[in-house]
């Protein structure tokens, strides 16, 4: 099948990303003061400390599960410091206008294939496709967010997610960019070889 190479490259990029990023996982528990300061466009000192660590280790800031105004405050400062960033789970709670603003800062926008396994999967997948098109394929990263016992294994799930993207009209080249090239660029990897047959 013509998209088999896309699945192969996607799996490779995902595994490379996991190996490189797991070394620098830092979890921060948000509190009310942090939320208030972010609403005013400020960050608590701990955020600056974490951004310093990320910069020192050439690591990636993966931010999600916080309010859009907090996201903007954090990622503006990350951009100012030269920290590569991705906003996770953008399809859930980050308005398209905010995604566009983040993309303009050089932030990658992650969209999770977990939506393909929800009860309302058709509508969720269509909504994600619309968001990707509104912001631009060049800013999108498509991952799975899988790993739960009731869902498929991540490599299988990524193949299903790729099929969903193709059904939404994305080309093989666009899918490859979202599942391989953009993740590779995020983690600072070298450009990949072209797919077999130059597609």
Labelled PLM ranges:
Residues 1, 61, 109, 145, ...:
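Divalent metal-coordination and catalytic microenvironments
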Residues 1-95:
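Divalent metal-binding pocket/active-site signature
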Residues 52-55, 75, 79-80, 99-106, ...:
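Acidic (Asp/Glu)-rich catalytic clusters
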Residues 137-154:
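Short acidic/histidine-rich active-site segments
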């Amino acid at each position: 099948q013509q998209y088999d190479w896309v699945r192969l490259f996607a799996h490779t990029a995902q595994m490379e990303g996991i190996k490189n990023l797991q070394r620098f996982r830092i979890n921060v528990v948000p509190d009310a003061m942090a939320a208030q300061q972010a609403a005013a466009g400020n960050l608590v000192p701990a955020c600056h400390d974490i951004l310093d660590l990320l910069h020192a280790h050439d690591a990636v800031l993966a931010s999600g599960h916080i309010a859009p105004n907090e996201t903007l405050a954090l990622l503006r400062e990350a951009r100012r410091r030269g920290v590569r960033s991705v906003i996770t789970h953008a399809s859930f709670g980050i308005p398209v206008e905010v995604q566009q603003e983040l993309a303009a800062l050089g932030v990658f926008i992650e969209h999770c294939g977990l939506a393909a396994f929800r009860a309302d999967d058709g509508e969720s997948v269509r909504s994600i496709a619309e968001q990707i098109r509104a912001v631009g394929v060049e800013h999108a990263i498509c991952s799975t967010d899988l790993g739960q016992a009731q869902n498929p294994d991540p490599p299988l799930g990524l193949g299903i997610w790729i099929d969903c993207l193709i059904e939404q009209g994305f080309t093989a080249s666009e899918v490859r960019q979202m599942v391989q090239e953009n993740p590779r660029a995020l983690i600072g990897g070298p450009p990949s070889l072209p797919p077999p047959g130059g597609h």
